[in-house]
């Protein structure tokens, strides 16, 4: 198990194999992840505690889904998305193992660009 500090909070990687990865993302209230998509990575998100808004789709037609404890969303490759913490929130993420597959479209912390395989 390892902890990775992020500008929006931290993540704990609790499982990492050649076939899947399990993480807990702790996002501090008022913080947001980058607007991003993945070319290959597929992930399922479940809110463990707290509330967040999940933005889905391109900026000109974004859907905002309020997610609370127990809510689940499946993110397919190519889906533009961003998590925004309404309160401190813990999100369980289970995904395919392509952790560096991130295409950032917008980032308030200055991490613009692509980390795609």
Where are these regions (language model features)?
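Double-stranded beta-helix
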Residues: 2-6, 84-117
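Short, surface-exposed secondary-structure edge patches
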Residues: 24, 44, 64-65
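Glycine- and acidic-residue-biased ligand/ion/polar-headgroup-sensing regions
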Residues: 40-58
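A short glycine-rich, His/Asp/Glu-containing loop-to-beta-strand
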Residues: 1-41
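Short acidic-glycine-tyrosine-enriched beta hairpin
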Residues: 58-78
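Histidine-centered metal-chelating micro-motifs
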Residues: 32-34, 38, 71-82
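Short glycine/proline-enriched turns and hinge-like loops at secondary-structure junctions
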Residues: 37-39, 46-47, 66, 85-87
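Short hydrophobic/aromatic-rich beta-strand segments that constitute the beta-sheet cores
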Residues: 34, 54-56, 93
